[in-house]
Amino acid sequence: MPSIISSTNPQYINKCVNNGTMASSTNVPDRTVGSKSFASSVSKNDGRLMQQMLRAFVNKALDDKAEGNFAGYEDLRRQFAAKSDTKDAPSSLQLQNLLSALTCNVSRLDSSNSSLVMSVLDSVWVSRDESFVRCYTRFLGNLISAQSNYLPLVMTMLIQHMLYRPDSLAIHYEHAHMALKYVLELVPRAHSFLYSSILEEFPYKDESLLAQMTYISNVLSICEYVPSIKGPVLHAIIDKIIQIDVEIQVEVDDDDEEEDEVVTDDDGTSNADSEVITASTLYERHTAISSEMTSSTILTPPSLTDTRQLMQQLDQLLYTLFSYLDSNLKSTSRDRYLVYNSLIKSFVNTVLKTFRCRYTQFLIFWASQLDPEFTDIFLGVLTEVCLDPSQPYTLRLSGAMYIGSYVARAKALEKNTIQIIVNMMTRWVEAYLDQCENELSDDLLSKHSVFYAINQSIFYIFCFRWRELCVSDESESMEPRPNEWIPGLEILHRSVLSRLNPLRYCSPNIVLQFAKVANHLNFMYVYSIIEQNRKGIFREGFDTMDAYFPFDPYRLTKSSIIVQPFYNEWQQIPGLDDDEEEEDTDYESSTVMLGESPF
C-alpha cells in the first residue's frame, strides 16, 4: 500500500489536518478529489489513525529537512507561526492535532530544529479552549524533559504571559499559571530559572499602573504554589516600589529648590510677600489624590515628572503588597515567619540604606506590630545596627533615626518595651560619655555623629512617650514629678550638660520641642543652654543633625487605611501652653526649618 505521508505535497497534508480525521480504508483517496468529497469519504471515528499519520508526517518533515528538503518542515512551522486573526490561520483543532504529533517527536526537536520550536513557543495558546491548553501544556513538559536546552526559553515564555496585555482576560492568566505549575512539578530543574525569569520581565517604573499591578499580582500568585521564591520575589517587588518612592522624593526636593529660588530677590533677600513653599506644602499639594483610579489614569503611563501620578502608583502598589502580606503574616503556619524574615532582610539590605525613602518602610512598620515576637525581632535588628561599633557609621545613623521614629510612632508597643529600648539607649550614651566626653575635636558633629543621632532619637521619643517613661501608672493627664521617671533617664541630664553639647548639634525642631516638654514636666530646664548655643551659632555658623524620621505621618490615600490603626499620632500634652516660652522665638527664627515638622 502506498503511504499517504510519503507525499511531499503540503496542500494534501493540510487537507488531512483541516478535516481532523483520516480515511479508515486502506485505499488512498485520489488527491484531486474535492474537499467535500474527501471529507465525506473519511471516517469520523478514526482519530487514532489520524494521529499516526500526523506523527508520520512530522517525522517525514524532520527527515526531509535533515536531507536538505525544507518544504514539509517549513509548512509545519508556518502552521504555528500564522497569526490567529488571518484568513488562512489554522484552527485550534488543527494545531492541537499537530501538537499531539510533535509531542511524540520531542526527542527529535534538538537545536537544529529550534526554529520550529520557537514558532510553537511564540504561538497563541492561552486564549484557546481548555483542550488545546492541556495539549500545549503536555507538549511543554515533554519538550523540556527531552530537550533541557529549551528550559530557559520555556520559562521566559510562561512568565511573559503574566504581563499585562490589553486583550488579556482572567482565564488567560489562569491558563499560564496552570502550565507553569505543571512544568515546575514535572521538571524540578525549572525552579532554578524561575526567579531570574520573573526578575527579567518586571515592568519598568514608568509603565502604566495597570501593567505594574497585573504583573505583581500574577507574580504573587506564583509564590502561592512556589513558596520557596516568596523571599526573593518580595525583595524584588520592594526594590521596584522603593525606586518609585525615591523618585517622588527627588521630585519634591527639586520642586522645593525651584520654589526657594522664586521667593528670593535678586539681592539675595527673602521676599516676605511671597509664599514660602516647604516640603510639607508640596507634600499636601501632591497627595490630594483620589482613592479610586479612573480608567484613563490606569491606561496612561505616568510621566516621570508627574509627582501626583507617581504617588498614586506608589499608593496602589503598597496597598497590594500590604494586602498580600496581611494574609500571609496573619496565618497560623510557620510560613509567616519566613515571610517576615524576608521583610526584615529586605529592610536591612535595601530600605535602611535608602535615605530618601518615604513610604516603603511602612511595610515593616506595620508588619512588626502584628505580633510581639515580630516587634522584638525588628527592634533587635535596629539596636544591633545602631549600637554596634563595627557597623558603618552611616548605617548606624540610619538605625538611630529608625529607632527613634519607630518607638515614638508604633502604636502597638507595650510600655515595658519602650522603657527597655530607652534604657538601652541611655546606657549607651553614658558609656560613650565615659569614653569620649573629654576628647577635643574641631568637628564634633562629624566625629560624634552617632552620639548626636542617638541623643536626638531619645529627645524625640521623650516628647511622644513621656507617659510610658514614668514609673507611675496613673492616667495620661497626670504631670510626673522628677522622682517618677524610669531609672537611667537621668543620664540625659549629664549628656545635655556635657562638653559634647547635643542640644547644639541636634535638629532645632527636636531641641525646641524637647525643651518645652521637659520643662513642662519638670524633667529638666534647658533654655539657658539653648540660648548659649544660639549665640554660638551666630559666631560659628549653622550645622546640625538632619531631622529625618522615617515614620513621619503617612499621607498616601488608599494604603493609609492599613497603616493608621497602628500609628501613634502626636498628642498635645495636658496643660502645656504652646506659647508659654517666648525665649525660643529668636532661636527658632534664626534657623532653617528642615521640611515637615516631625510633630
Swiss-Prot record:
Its main location: nucleus. Keywords: Nucleus, Transcription, Transcription regulation. It holds the Pfam family RRN3. The keyword NAD does not apply. GO terms for cellular component: cytosol; nucleus; RNA polymerase I transcription regulator complex. Residues 577-599 are annotated as: Disordered. Coiled coil: none annotated. InterPro entries: ARM-type_fold, RNA_pol_I_trans_ini_fac_RRN3. Residues 577-587 have a biased composition (Acidic residues). GO terms for molecular function: RNA polymerase I core binding; RNA polymerase I general transcription initiation factor activity. GO terms for biological process: transcription initiation at RNA polymerase I promoter. It is found in: Nucleus. Belongs to the RRN3 family. Required for efficient transcription initiation by RNA polymerase I. This is RNA polymerase I-specific transcription initiation factor rrn3. It comes from Schizosaccharomyces pombe (strain 972 / ATCC 24843) (Fission yeast). The gene is rrn3.
